[in-house]
């Protein structure tokens, strides 16, 4: 790696590191979407919900002056449970009939693949610096790109799941919005995908600049 490319690689890896932290935060948290139910005029409280890839949390909160349910950050009685298809011993009847089981399992499984690609990419990147083997940055970059693509697919599956749930005739939820976990996953996708492509370009051998040069004239990699 040439001295001019080393700073670019370090900056790119720092951006990828931020993407890794955001991706892990999104996968383990349960604020991908926030749901609000239909409100009756005589109600004084409402039960809002937020959920992620693995579990749903409901919170009973007092209605505001505008008769709206929320925001979800208001104090109230909170109850969290894992989705029944992940933990049969848990009870989540309030959500079980309105969610799409296949969508939920698919989004969670794809996110696990993303974390696996992140681990393999990080191992390659560490070996590239510790063993002075710059060529390992190329597979590392591809692993990061694959991780970003998996996150994108997981985001789209989750978005379709929420949309189908809201459109269902059996659901009690009529309003929703995506929360900070979803935003973390979106930011992680951008950082990992663009960072992986940039890292791949920076780690490629120098191309010939003149017609009489060849790739064999480039500086050897260590």
From Swiss-Prot:
Topological domains annotated Extracellular: 30-108, 156-179
Tissue specificity note: Skeletal muscle (at protein level).
Transmembrane stretches, start-end:
11-29, 109-129, 135-155, 180-204
GO cellular component terms, A-Z: L-type voltage-gated calcium channel complex; plasma membrane; sarcolemma; T-tubule
- GO BP annotations, alphabetical order: calcium ion transmembrane transport; positive regulation of muscle contraction; regulation of calcium ion transmembrane transport via high voltage-gated calcium channel
Q: How does it sit in the membrane?
A: Multi-pass membrane protein
Q: List locations, semicolon-separated.
A: Cell membrane, Sarcolemma
Show which residues constitute the signal peptide.
none
Segments on the Cytoplasmic face: 1-10, 130-134, 205-222
Question: Does the keyword Metal-binding feature in the UniProt annotation?
Answer: no
Sites carrying a glycan are 43, 79
Annotated function: Regulatory subunit of the voltage-gated calcium channel that gives rise to L-type calcium currents in skeletal muscle. Regulates channel inactivation kinetics.
Q: Into which family does the record put it?
A: Belongs to the PMP-22/EMP/MP20 family. CACNG subfamily.
Record-given protein name: Voltage-dependent calcium channel gamma-1 subunit
């Amino acid at each position: 790696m040439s001295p001019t490319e080393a700073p670019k690689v370090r900056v790119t890896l720092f951006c990828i590191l931020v993407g890794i932290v955001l991706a892990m935060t999104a996968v383990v948290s349960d604020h991908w979407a926030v749901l609000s139910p239909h409100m009756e005029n005589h109600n004084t409280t409402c039960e809002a919900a937020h959920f992620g890839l693995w579990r749903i949390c409901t919170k009973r909160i007092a209605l505001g002056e505008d008769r709206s349910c929320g925001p979800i950050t208001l104090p109230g009685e909170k109850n969290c449970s894992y989705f029944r298809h992940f933990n049969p011993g848990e009870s989540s009847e309030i959500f079980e009939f309105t969610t799409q089981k296949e969508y939920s399992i698919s989004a969670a499984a794809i996110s696990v693949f993303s974390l696996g690609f992140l681990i393999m990419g990080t191992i390659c990147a560490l070996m590239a610096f510790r063993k002075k083997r710059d060529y390992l940055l190329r597979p590392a970059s591809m692993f990061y790109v694959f991780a970003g693509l998996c996150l994108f697919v997981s985001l789209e599956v989750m978005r379709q799941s929420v949309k189908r749930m809201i459109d269902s005739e059996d659901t009690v939820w009529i309003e929703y919005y995506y929360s900070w976990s979803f935003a973390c996953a979106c930011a992680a996708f951008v950082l990992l995908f663009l960072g992986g492509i940039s890292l791949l370009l920076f780690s490629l051998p120098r191309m010939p600049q003149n017609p009489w040069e060849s790739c064999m004239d480039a500086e050897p990699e260590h």
